[in-house]
A protein has these predicted regions:
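Conserved binding/catalytic microenvironments
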Residues: 1-222, 226-254
């Protein structure tokens, strides 16, 4: 069964289809799609965008975001929508005349599959999965329903404020397993003062930074305790006489 918030979004999407179907089809006619299914999926995405705009009108939502400093749970309550819907909507506030913070967004399951991704912040997000295990979008599964905030530093020195929280999808009967996903949202550290989740974090404190990468295969951090695979672009020293937390992590590779 779908949640009330999902039903509301679906109803709004049906309204959008009735009111803007011709305009959307005209827009899609300007693109070439490999299959009819891919065209329909794109249309669903556009209808969902319209639905979110109906439930969370741009100017009103933008004003509330600024007032509440992008407090997602308060925004969720204000607009009677879901946590994921609000997190997705804040990534859409990019009208040049009234822009919001450029966020990145991703949704993952417990197997690490990335089922939704946007990167307006500039951070690199793997397309299919296997992202860095140090991202808090994964550690959020250890504390279900609790928002985690962290300052993450990429290999190139760029810093991002990242938050994550788990959500449950659907309403199941007693005893039925629920689908649990993790929602990640973040922005460049320069927007920290406008993002409520940095109020208890000193973004300039280097000791609070969490070194992250894109994925193990492309990461330079040879001393990472969570490395699962060797890097593709660097020579890796396998030491038969030492043992670290992983066969890919040794004292020789930490230097």
């Amino acid at each position: 069964y779908s949640s009330l918030e999902t039903k509301k979004l679906h109803a709004a999407a049906q309204i959008a289809q009735e009111g803007a179907n011709k305009e959307i089809d005209n827009y899609l006619s300007g693109f070439s799609f490999p299959t009819e299914e891919s065209r329909k999926l794109t249309k669903i995405a556009l209808l969902n965008y319209c639905a979110a705009a109906i439930l969370m009108p741009y100017e009103l939502f933008h004003a509330e975001c600024k007032k509440l400093k992008y407090d997602l749970e308060l925004l969720q309550n204000t607009f009677a929508t879901s946590f994921e819907q609000v997190a997705h909507r804040v990534t859409c506030l990019q009208d040049p005349k009234l822009p919001g913070i450029p966020f990145h967004f991703l949704r993952v399951d417990m197997a690490g599959n990335i089922s939704k991704r946007f990167s307006l912040s500039g951070i690199d997000i793997p397309r299919y999965g296997g992202a860095c295990p140090r991202w808090n979008v994964y550690s959020a599964f250890t504390r279900p329903g609790v928002i985690q905030a962290a300052v993450s530093k990429m290999n190139n020195g760029e810093k991002y404020v990242c938050i994550a929280r788990t959500v449950e999808k659907g309403i199941g009967r007693f005893g039925q397993a629920k689908s649990v996903l993790s929602i990640g949202l973040g922005c460049e550290a320069k927007y920290a003062k406008d993002f409520i989740y940095t109020e208890n974090i000193n973004v300039n404190d280097k000791s609070s930074e969490i070194p992250i990468g894109v994925s193990c295969r492309t990461c330079d951090r040879l001393d990472c305790s969570q490395r699962a695979f060797p890097p593709l672009h660097k020579k890796f020293d396998v030491d038969l006489n030492s043992r670290g937390v992983s066969v890919y992590v040794s004292d020789n590779n930490s230097k």
